[in-house]
């Protein structure tokens, strides 16, 4: 039998993501966005020992802003994660990791509100409004950090990207990542869509198509598909195959049923 091996796409994913985990060139900047802290907390915790700067945006930034004592109106927030966000901010300080949060934001009464859109400092969010994007000053702040970065990982939008009025922050970050000279990895549907929209996908070192599997890998988790490839003693009677797809989420039983 021929040995079981990873396909070329899977090999490429592991090579690029592995470089970030093992020995990233400094300064190492991570940009994390999206709606929930829950979805990305594992990445932040796993990279705290190696990252220099973390830039946070999207709905999850609201939880961190609240942890710092900011009033965020009717914005999306995970109240049960506020203490965890505060702990992460404190741990980052101990490790000399710079976590940057939005300094200004785009607000409105709701997703469909076009008349009440306004930009304000995060300290001036009105009680009846929602934060729906990072503001222009935050984009400039994040651009400054990315300009001198040598390694950049970006996953998640900075606002409600699918609505044009709240897509400018994500687009601004996309341009900043693409125009940096860093080794760059971008993952997540909205992040990739932003790059495509501004026509700069070609300037990214690696666009990850691993989805949830790549996130788990960055969290430091052992992925079943990789474990099975490395497990020389497991079920020696099995028929070895070449796996040519990005199916690292599959466990051994899932893989057996798949084939």
Q: Where does each model-flagged region fall?
A:
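Active-site loop-to-helix "anion-binding N-cap" substructures in soluble metabolic enzymes
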Residues: 1-259
């Amino acid at each position: 039998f021929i040995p079981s091996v990873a396909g070329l796409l899977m090999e490429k994913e592991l090579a690029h993501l592995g470089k970030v985990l093992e020995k990233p060139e400094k300064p190492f900047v991570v940009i994390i966005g999206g709606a929930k802290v829950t979805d990305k907390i594992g990445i932040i915790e796993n990279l705290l020992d190696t990252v220099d700067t973390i830039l946070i945006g999207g709905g999850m930034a609201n939880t961190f802003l609240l942890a710092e004592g900011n009033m965020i109106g009717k914005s999306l927030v995970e109240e049960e994660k506020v203490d965890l966000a505060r702990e992460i901010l404190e741990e980052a300080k101990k490790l000399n990791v710079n976590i940057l949060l939005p300094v200004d934001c785009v607000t409105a009464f709701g997703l469909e509100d076009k008349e009440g859109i306004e930009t304000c400092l995060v300290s001036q969010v009105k009680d009846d409004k929602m934060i729906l994007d990072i503001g222009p000053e935050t984009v400039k702040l994040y651009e400054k950090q990315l300009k001198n970065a040598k390694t950049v990982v970006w996953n998640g939008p900075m606002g409600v990207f699918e609505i044009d009025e709240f897509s400018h922050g994500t687009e601004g970050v996309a341009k900043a990542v693409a125009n940096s000279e860093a080794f760059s990895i971008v993952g997540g549907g909205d992040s990739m869509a932003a790059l495509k929209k501004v026509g700069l996908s070609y300037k990214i070192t690696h666009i990850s198509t691993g989805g949830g599997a790549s996130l788990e890998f960055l969290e430091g988790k052992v992925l079943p598909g990789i474990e099975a490839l490395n497990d020389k003693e497991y079920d020696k009677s099995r028929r070895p195959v070449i796996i040519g797809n990005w199916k690292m989420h599959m466990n051994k039983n899932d893989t057996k049923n798949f084939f």
